[in-house]
Amino acid sequence: MTQRYELVISPTARRQLTERLPESVAFAAYEFIVGPLLDNPQRVGKRLRPPLEDRHSARRGTYRVIYRIDTTDRRVTVVGVVHRSDAYR
């Protein structure tokens, strides 16, 4: 089995998880982030189109987990957890 990716959560994403999202959504997003996302980030999400091509997006109901993958350092940086209507603005 391959080694898991290291997790980095941006200050914005941390604030969204702890203060802005409904508790049930924040819990589900966090479980996803520390589980399947760190196991295989390329498989659980899709690469975004320009100008956001350095990011990936994974669906969690009507919310999106937006993240960057650094394959060299095996690091996933979560940059946001937002409702899909606001995710790509």
Predicted regions and their residues:
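Glycine-rich phosphate-binding loop
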Residues: 62
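Short hydrophobic/aromatic beta-strand micro-patches
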Residues: 68
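Residues forming the ATP-binding cleft of Hanks-type serine/threonine protein kinase domains
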Residues: 82
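Basic, Lys/Arg-enriched alpha-helical interface segments
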Residues: 1-59, 71-77, 85-89
